[in-house]
Amino acid sequence: PMGGDAYYLMREGTLSGTALEPRHAELLLVTVLASDYSNWTSVHMDGARRAGASEAEIAEAVLCAVPVAGLSAWVVGATAMDAGKN
């Protein structure tokens, strides 16, 4: 429980009250997580949508992962995008 509380506070501190708009912070997290082939990519895609990001912006964020992580990053991102549309 304490670890979860600490993580939540850290996450809120990095996604709100910063120079980046929440939409941009979520899109950056989509790029980073897609490049790491993380299952959490979809969570931040949902966050980006809630913050006002378009599907085109989310796709662009995934594409930014491809040069450093390869086409596998696109597979992770495309799968997460498809799941988020349902």
Residue ranges and their predicted role:
Residues P1-H24, M45-R50, W74-N86:
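Acidic, glycine/proline-rich low-complexity segments that act as flexible tails and inter-domain linkers
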Residues E21-L27, A56-E60:
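Alpha-helical scaffolds flanking conserved acidic
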Residues H24-N39:
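Amphipathic, charged-and-aliphatic alpha-helical interface segments
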Residues T31-V32, H44, V62:
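Buried hydrophobic packing segments
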Residues A34-Y37, C64-L71:
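A short structural micro-motif
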Residues S38-A59:
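Mid-chain, well-packed structural core segment of small domains
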Residues W40, E60, G70-A73, G77:
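Short linear functional motifs in flexible/disordered or boundary regions
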Residues E57-V66, A78-K85:
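Hydrophobic transmembrane alpha-helix bundles
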